A protein has these predicted regions:
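N-terminal basic/disordered segments at the start of proteins
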Residues: 1-12
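A short, acidic, flexible beta-alpha connecting loop/helix-capping segment that sits on the rim
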Residues: 222-228
Length: 248
């Protein structure tokens, strides 16, 4: 029951979600749109996002901006900074118990498919899933190709989604392919939330295509917090994810 209760804080009654990742500072440092953490959180929460995805430090200092207004997905893994010569391994940086103390509604863990460190990340994910489920906390697994050139290839994304599901995640965060995504969704028995990736010219059309293909929502960072008005952008995306789907 605990897992289902917490998932309801992330996904609406329609089973859809708009998550705003604000975790880029953990590896990129202060970037455009996130120089002021308080303002960044406030803007996306005012837009009506279902949840935010952040690192432990931001969760601890900015809780008054989101508590009771948006769900908290806490990232517990980290790999490197933008200066690292080897950014292909993500290790545990926060325990599940600490995530609980910070009020997490869900745990987020990274798995890079095709990395030289797949085995180590598999082991970490297995332990995190076990620890989280023992405490009634759901896991959102961000499973993406290690090599960005494969980010939108159906074969790679199919493996990413299915592997995350098979390892026990309650939801998957990965990319939406331009073709074959419906079959990827069918082969994954847990919700798939679409990662935003780099900024694109028309994120709204990307979301419409993903939702039509069976996505359970989005987790858009740069396409939201670097928008001219993040609050307005969240409202637009929320309408597409929730209202547009409800009208079908």
């Amino acid at each position: 029951a605990g897992i289902d209760i917490r998932l309801r804080r992330i996904f609406g009654e329609d089973g859809k979600t708009v998550i705003c990742p604000l975790d880029f500072g953990g590896f990129m440092g202060p970037v455009e749109g996130l120089f002021d953490p308080s303002a960044a959180v406030r803007k996306v929460v005012e837009g009506g996002c279902d949840a935010i995805l952040v690192n432990p430090g931001l969760a601890a200092t900015e809780w008054e901006s989101y508590a009771g207004k948006a769900g908290l997905v806490l990232r517990v893994t980290g790999g490197s900074t933008k200066f690292s010569p080897n950014p292909t391994f993500h290790t545990l940086v926060c325990s599940v118990e600490e995530a609980c103390r910070l009020g997490a509604d869900a745990i987020c863990i990274m798995l890079l498919v095709g990395s030289d460190y797949e085995q180590e990340m598999f082991e970490i994910m297995g332990q995190v899933v076990s620890d989280s489920h023992s405490l009634g906390i759901p896991v959102l697994a961000e499973v993406i190709p290690c090599d960005p050139s494969h980010s939108f290839e159906p074969e790679w994304i199919s493996v990413c989604a299915r592997v995350g599901y098979e390892l026990g995640a309650d939801a998957i965060k990965t990319y939406c392919t331009s073709e074959g995504f419906e079959e990827i969704v069918k082969a994954c028995r847990v919700p798939i939330v679409i990662a935003g990736g780099p900024k694109v010219e028309d994120p709204n059309s990307v979301v419409r295509r993903a939702m039509a293909a069976g996505a359970a929502g989005i987790a858009f960072g740069r396409n939201v917090f670097q928008a001219p008005d993040p609050t307005v952008k969240v409202r637009e995306l929320y309408s597409i994810v929730h209202e547009d789907c409800r009208c079908k």
